[in-house]
Amino acid sequence: MADAAGLFSNSSIPVHYSPRSPIRWIRPSASATNDDCARADAYEPIIEIFVHNFILHEIVFESDHQARAAMASDKVAIGGFQFEQRHGKSRVRVARVWRDDRGHHYFVEWSVNISLLSDCLPAYTSGDNSDIVATDTMKNTVYVKAKECNDQISAEEFAIFLAKHFTSYYKQVTAAIVNIVEKPWERVFIDGEPHKHGFKLGSEKHTTEVIVKKSGELQITSGIEGLSVLKTTQSGFEGFIRDKYTVLPETRERMLATEVSASWRYPYASLSGIPSKPSYFVERYLDIKQSLVETFFGSPKEGVYSPSVQSTLLHMARNVLNRFPDVASIKLNMPNIHFLPVNLSSKDTQIVKFNDDVYMPTDEPHGSIEASLSRIQSKI
């Protein structure tokens, strides 16, 4: 296959999406069969917590864990035990350059992880490796497929390209999981003009995980890691539980800093549903990153007040789902990275009096705030 972009064709976005979560208690409906239990609509809600047409999952992104497990499960029974296996190759580093007719170069560097679910039980039970795809072969395949991509593609497209190859080329492979982290190389600008072949290393990383089953069933998750943001005002923390262990003072004026990790799932269940636009995934990644940043900071002149990291996190997640109907769910992890006020005193005098000006940065220990937001279909 010479052009990975040829994988995709036009189709409308599926509208049905009904994830499960730790705070949406469910049970199989009375009419559900064993086969039905893989479907979200085979379950009936017992308790649902709604947040403006979304459902909020706190602490654990259970819906993604369940969906991922359903997509990539290959369990068998051995001697009265349940056995599940997979094998793959991790941290395969590959860089690719594309050149256009105007002499502009385009560059990506990826770290690729591959995991195959396959029918190779004899390798474990009797030492028969005849059904094993060697991990060195997987590594080589990454470079072969990168060479075959004549046109510039996204990390998501390359992950789909690889996963589709493994599930179609090897009869014993039932599913492939491809995880890619893209190193943040950015084009250099000299005197305001983009350099044709010059790049510098940025900060936050573009991530993706793709699961492809032999049947063609698909799951795509994209994300961002290392998005460091900070504002020096318009943040506070009040009204929290106070007990004999509490020494933290309440405040309406503090610095707020975090390193955002976000992952979002697309609703596409098959290749035919993915938009054919070549730059679709890259543009959506940049759009979502911009939305997260804008919501965190607010307007350039006024900003926006944050009463807690939790409140800001929900606003950020909700704005992504409101703006982008092609995002089914989003998970955010936002540690509260502390800048502690500095007050220094000796026995006789105060050396430094804090006036919202001198801080001691520290990231250990730090607060840990994580939640996810998913679309639901209300039956009300």
Label each region the model flagged:
Residues 31, 41-42:
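Short, low-complexity intrinsically disordered segments enriched in A/P/G/S/L with frequent Arg
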Residues 20-22, 33, 53-54, 58:
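Short linear/disordered segments characteristic of secreted peptide precursors
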Residues 9-12, 18-21, 29-31, 63:
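Serine residues within intrinsically disordered or low-complexity segments
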Residues 8, 69-290, 294-380:
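N-terminal intrinsically disordered, cationic/polar leader segments
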Residues 1-9, 61-73:
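PEST-like, low-complexity acidic/proline-rich intrinsically disordered segments
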